[in-house]
């Protein structure tokens, strides 16, 4: 029932039509030959299979089956980057049209680092646009209620410094393409700069400070 899969981490190709990265597998023979996606920052786990089973598992040999138990699947192992996610959406939309199917995209990811959560991010805008075209997006309610990665604070100073940890390329041979999302308050001036440090806290490279007057959300 898996029609095709796009492994965005695998560089050997061939990439899907219209894209220049990753490797696509389409049809039973290619999917069986691939066996698995490329090891990456997420590691191997059962989360994708788990939620796919909830969405459309056949229930064979069990007392339970998924909601859309006769549906076909499109799979994407995507880079943790807004552009890559939107590429995945676009590829799925085109592939569903090719096969004459309605498209429902599952977003049970547990990722909260793809831009602001107020509907203005690039991913949110893509979802709005594709929803108007009839694509259905499904997401989980989340299970991070006891995690302490959200903060709310009013700072006395208007200049802040923050440390950002990147994924270790040496430990993740197939990792490439990382990004940082930053945004300011509508109608206020927002400036940002970026510096790279080594393990001894020595500055290796630093950008200028860029000031922007934000006039819209």
Segments from the language model and where they lie:
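Subtilisin-like serine protease catalytic core
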Residues: 1-85, 100-104, 132-136, 148-149, ...
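Substrate-binding/access-modulating region of protease and related hydrolase catalytic domains
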Residues: 78-155, 159-201, 210
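Solvent-exposed serine/threonine-rich low-complexity stretches and specific carbohydrate-binding patches
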Residues: 204-217
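Short intrinsically disordered, low-complexity coil segments enriched in acidic
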Residues: 1-5, 196-198, 216-217
């Amino acid at each position: 029932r898996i029609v095709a899969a796009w492994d965005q981490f695998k560089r050997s190709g061939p990439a899907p039509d219209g894209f220049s990265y990753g490797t696509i597998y389409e049809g039973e023979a290619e999917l069986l030959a691939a066996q698995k996606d490329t090891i990456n920052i997420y590691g191997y786990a059962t989360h994708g299979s788990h939620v796919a089973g909830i969405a459309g598992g056949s229930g064979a040999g069990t007392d339970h089956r998924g909601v859309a138990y006769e549906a076909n699947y499109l799979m994407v192992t995507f880079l943790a980057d807004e552009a890559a996610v939107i590429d995945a959406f676009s590829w799925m939309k085109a592939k569903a049209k090719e096969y004459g199917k309605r498209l429902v995209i599952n977003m049970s990811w547990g990722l909260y680092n793809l831009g602001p959560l107020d509907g203005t991010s690039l991913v949110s805008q893509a979802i709005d646009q594709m929803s108007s075209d009839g694509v259905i997006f499904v997401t989980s309610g989340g299970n991070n209620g006891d995690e302490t990665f959200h903060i709310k604070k009013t700072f006395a100073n208007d200049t802040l410094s923050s440390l950002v940890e990147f994924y270790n390329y040496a430990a993740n041979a197939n990792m490439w393409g990382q990004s940082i999302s930053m945004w300011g308050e509508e109608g206020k001036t927002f400036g940002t700069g970026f510096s790279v440090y080594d393990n001894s806290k020595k500055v290796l490279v630093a950008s200028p400070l860029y000031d922007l007057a934000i006039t819209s959300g």
